[in-house]
Amino acid sequence: MLLLVMTLAVFMPVSANAAPKTNQWVNKGGYRYYYNQKGKKVKNKVKQIGKFRYSFDKKGRMQTGWQIFGSKKAYFSKKSGRMQVNKKVNGVKIGKSGYVKRSKTELKEQKVLEKAKQIL
């Protein structure tokens, strides 16, 4: 029996890569990532994970602070990354949806800032 176990241990292929990460958080290189049920990083979206929503950029990095989505903006906790709901952050009211509707003036200002960034 011992000989069988030793033989199997020698001839069993061992993968250098760890098993795929599924439905879990991974901290790597100072960033936080979430791998979905298929083992792929969640990228470029707001995703509900458990009871909370989180924002991920195009590389799959969890985003914190104020994030802008078209005409809406949302705040994600600097500590946990969770989308804040039914709160006031920096004097701005956030409703139960988690989003703050932006005024036309804010949208125009944002467009000007985006153009300025392209020039610089």
Where is each model-derived feature located?
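Extracellular adhesion/carbohydrate-binding repeat motifs centered on closely spaced tryptophans
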Residues: 1-119
